[in-house]
Structures are given as structure tokens and as C-alpha cells.
């Protein structure tokens, strides 16, 4: 597992309000040196989310999808499904920029 790798993420059991529902992909955004922790920071994706400066578009499994930087969350690595590949370098840079925007860095 490395930063920028994409995994299938099963749906949460208790989503509320505007939290994402349904199975989707998740991009690992945690720094590689912290991947040994018991939890993992990921940003979920959506094919139906509206375009925004903090939602970079990436290609996953041949389909355009948006990374929801504003919904970055912590998951137990055991919740992740199989790896679906890795983001291209330019896509990961776009995710980094979105995270900086959302976090005010």
C-alpha cells in the first residue's frame, strides 16, 4: 500500500446527512511514513458529485470520477477491498492541491 493507491471502499453502515453512501473507490492520502498506523486517511470518490476546485477529476477503471477531498476520512485498513491501481503523478498532485485548499494549508 502506498500514498495515491486506490482501493474499493464498502459502504458505511451509518451514513447520515450528506455523507457518502454506497460502495466507491477511496484514494490513500496518508503519507507513506505513517502507513503503519492502525488507521488510514482516505479520500472517497464520486462519479456524480458536482465539479468544484476542491474535487479533482481522476480516471479510475476507465471512468472519470471526482475525489472528494472535503470528505477525507479515517478508516481501518481492513475495510478496504482490493487495490484498483494508483493515481497518475499529475492526478495525485491535483489531490494534494485540493487537500491543501480544504485544510487551509
Where do the PLM segments sit?
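Conserved functional hotspots at enzyme active or ligand-binding sites that engage polyanionic ligands
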Residues: 1-105
